[in-house]
A protein has these predicted regions:
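A detector of single, family-specific signature residues
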Residues: 1-309
Length: 309
């Protein structure tokens, strides 16, 4: 007699894949923290490059940081020299005068040493993350690689996110009877609190933290795509429920779609930003026809054919 639900226990290979993805996630978080620390250190020395270059850790940013740590004065001659050596790009966010002005800070020996340490740590983290990316790619089997390719078609999901999602939920969706069961397991279903027939708002249930956080990040990226289903969904929910709830709702929808894609082995097709408008139009037509029937009015088949659903 089955009184308890079955629990999925991944095999050793999949557990190792999860550990690789989980460790990569922690290193990515550490990398972001170190980059923020570097930015704060520069601002403390009255050097603000965030409005001058798009990526402080890019090629141009690294060349400018080398110059800052050296203690030399950055002037017109230094700018032209770096430009001639192709160490900085001609197409920076700020013009030449603004860049020279932003580089005129006052950096102490201690600050210079700390910047060197932070930059070394950033390089080490980037190297470790790159190594883990290769290990994860080599660890995936053919079925998991196909699943990653299917999931990547969804807006907001990158290679890294797709690999992490597959490492957690696997490729066999038969162990989740419905998409709602998967969302509940992932901690993306709202709490169900009802009293006296009135349903109250509740927090989302507990679930897999790594899966939930990954999907929330994907949702933030997905809603930025113009004229998309997720973008329109976010706008509609955020207008009356708030941004945070809207992001969780989008993450919930993404996980539902992932279940459908893996269950049916289908490619993703965006429903478009006009999906909700068409759906509302159809519902209004159906409601109107029912009201007419209640009044004893029945439309002829040729009249119904003229109604566009």
């Amino acid at each position: 007699m089955d009184f308890l639900n079955r629990v999925f226990i991944p095999n050793r290979r999949q557990r190792e894949l999860r550990e690789l993805c989980r460790y990569r996630k922690s290193l990515i978080v550490d990398l972001g923290a170190e980059k923020n620390r570097l930015q704060k250190m520069l601002e403390g020395a009255n050097i603000k490059l965030s409005g001058t270059i798009s990526d402080i850790n890019g090629k141009s940013g690294k060349a400018l940081l080398d110059y800052i740590v050296s203690g030399e004065i950055f002037d017109d001659e230094a700018y032209e020299r770096l430009l001639a050596e192709k160490l900085i790009s001609k197409r920076l966010k700020a013009p030449k005068k603004q860049l020279i002005k932003d580089m005129q800070g006052c950096i102490s020996p201690i600050q210079a040493k700390m910047i060197k340490v932070i930059r070394t740590h950033i390089s080490e983290l980037e190297a470790h993350i790159k190594e883990l990316n290769d290990d994860i790619s080599n660890h995936l089997n053919e079925e998991e690689e196909n699943a990653v390719e299917l999931i990547k078609d969804i807006p907001g999901i990158s290679d890294t996110s797709a690999q992490t999602i597959v490492s957690i939920i696997g490729t066999d969706m038969s162990r989740f009877p419905t998409s709602g069961a998967l969302c509940s397991w992932g901690g993306l279903c709202p709490g169900n609190h009802e009293s006296a027939g009135k349903r109250k708002n509740g927090r989302t249930n507990k679930g897999n933290k790594l899966l939930r956080s990954t999907l929330v990040v994907c949702a933030h990226s997905a809603v930025l795509k113009k004229d998309s289903y997720f973008g329109e969904m976010y706008k509609r929910i955020a207008s009356h429920r708030g941004r945070k709830r809207a992001i969780v709702a989008v993450a919930h929808a993404i996980l539902q779609i992932i279940w459908q894609l893996l269950k049916k082995n289908e490619r993703y097709e965006d429903l478009g930003s006009d999906y909700f408008e068409k759906k509302n139009h159809k519902n209004k037509l159906v409601s109107t026809l029912k009201r007419l029937e209640n009044f004893g009015i029945t439309l002829m088949p040729e009249q119904l054919a003229q109604v566009a659903f």
